[in-house]
Amino acid sequence: MSQDYLWFLAAVFFALIGFGLHYAQKHPTRWALRFQVTTSVILIVWAIIILVIQFLIVVEASKKVEPGLDYVIVLGGRIKENGKPSKALRERLDMVVDYARDNQDTYFVLSGGRGEDEPCTEAEGMAEYLIEEGVRKDRLLVELQSRNTHQNIWYSKALIEKNIQDNLGTMNGNLGDNAGPVLVAEEKPKRIGILTSDFHLFRAMGLARKAEYREFYGISAKCDVWLYLHFAMRETLAILKDKFMGYM
């Protein structure tokens, strides 16, 4: 569902509420009074829900960045018609550039398929931007199929697990054909970061928890206030939807 569509639905909803309250004041019957009370309760409950969710979003986004992670999953965003990342996505990628410079052993999983109005997959657009900014290509893994945050989390987890197994196979292959049976002790869990915009991080972390990530940390890319406010309503609805669907 597009952002504009959500704003339109919200505008229609509050317009209907406003019309109903105005009508109830002009025609003060018993049913009108009940409508006023019911509507007021709904609005108060909705306001409390929004405030609680926004508080949780701010708390999650304020946590300290964990250094030295094995993998960082970078959640995709819109790629513009000219192939360049949107403002919100560019802020995420600039955070990747900084983290890559300070943490030389970290791999980055770029997660995002191709939207209807995008010239390429979000993962490919992100990879191109990061390579231009000096991040080595061999540190990038691309996940090209996901279409939403839920899929970002699950598909990226599968890609990381495959990469770990491939590296383990390479290690065993280097031992030679005559090495005999090899017992490999279970490795400690890989430390995984999830990097996305500040308004988006709380939901992404909830989805990762449901997907049974073992040791994971959030990395928040700050966005400007107006962009945050623009996404606040959509993210609130998305969190409620994912909670209802059992994704969080």
Named regions from a protein language model:
Residues 45, 51-234:
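A structural signal for short, hydrophobic/glycine-enriched beta-strand patches
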Residues 26, 58-62, 246-247:
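Transmembrane helix-loop junctions in multipass membrane proteins, especially transporters and channels
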Residues 21-25, 49-57, 241:
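Membrane-water interface at transmembrane helix exits
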Residues 24-36:
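Membrane-interface helix-boundary motifs at transmembrane edges
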Residues 8-10, 34-44:
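Alpha-helical transmembrane segments of integral membrane proteins
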Residues 15-19, 42-52:
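Alpha-helical transmembrane segments
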Residues 229-248:
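A transmembrane-helix-recognition feature enriched in membrane-embedded lipid enzymes
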Residues 1-25:
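Membrane-embedded alpha-helical segments of integral membrane proteins
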